[in-house]
Amino acid sequence: MLFHRTGVFEKVKLLPPFIHRIAAGLALLLLPVCASAQELTPGAYWPLPGGINILTFVDSFNWGDIAFEPSVPVDDAHATINTTAAAFTRTLSIAGRSANVGFQLPVVVGHLEGLYVGVHTELDRFGLGDPRLSIGVNLYGAPAMAPKAFASYRMHTLVGASLTVAPPLGQYDNTKVINLGTNRWSVKPELGLTHASGRWVVELMAGVWLFTDNTDFAGGRTREQAPIGSTQAHLTYRFAPRIWLAGDANFYTGGQTTVAGVKHLDLQRNSRIGSTFSWALDNHHSFRASISRGAYTTIGADFTSVAVGYNYAWTR
């Protein structure tokens, strides 16, 4: 049910065509993968010694406005979305290079509201989003190292690559136009360049999200989405070996959707800016906090986001 508190839309089969434009637009918001192109991830390719296990807990709170394509009769739309995720990462060696593999599982709570043809309407969701599997390897500048060798390592110029896969395992119900799972596969290859000089670190990343079709969208329709290209830039200052602060920015474009053969005017050209702070207490415990906001938004979520995370690391 969509906007269930007013009963405006009770069954997917009865929805007029433009409602599916609303559904396609909202589908960009609640899903954890939808926010993936918006990510700001400083330090993603910084090397670690092999044989380290890292357990991570992250809570992010997002709130703001929603921009729809002009033909959608929704005004004053805004949302609050809270995502709590648990993740596990293992560092290792691949062909003599430092690398890592990871798994992440998100739980999402979302509330959306706005004016549909002048009537105040609301929607709530709670459940599991699509998980993510990832693998990353430093192709240049960071060979695989044991902890003793890593203690004397100094980062200079790195080139890394990663692959993230989100299988369609999140909560999904084809009788609802808005779901937490995507009912499709999402894959993101990415390249990253890191250069460190003294206390400063500059990072540039470029990737693209690729999507399979959702063949059971909103009552059995097929929803296609074009790739979303994303770039990130980060400038980090290291106050001490375990404490750093980064300025973050990104830009992402693409993602136009087609539902039942009808193209929507929802091409995204959006960007975000923010800042990230990281503090490691010792070799086992570290904390990270970040804040970001939309700098330019055409279609989708113009959100402010605040996140806090905790990492626990151990060997073998």
Predicted regions and their residues:
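Residues that define the transmembrane beta-barrel architecture of outer-membrane proteins
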Residues: 51, 78-86, 126-133, 157, ...
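Transmembrane beta-strands of outer-membrane beta-barrel proteins
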Residues: 53-55, 99-103, 133, 157-163, ...
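Residues on the lipid-exposed face of transmembrane beta-strands in outer-membrane beta-barrel proteins
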Residues: 57-59, 86-90, 133-139, 163, ...
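Transmembrane beta-strands of outer-membrane beta-barrel pores
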Residues: 59-65, 105-111, 139, 165-171, ...
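Surface-exposed strand-loop-strand hairpins of Gram-negative outer-membrane beta-barrel proteins
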Residues: 62-83, 121, 174-179
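Repeated loop/turn-to-beta-strand initiation elements of outer-membrane beta-barrel proteins
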Residues: 64-66, 96-99, 143, 199-202, ...
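Outer-membrane pore/translocation modules
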Residues: 109-224, 266
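Outer membrane beta-barrel transmembrane domains
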Residues: 218-316
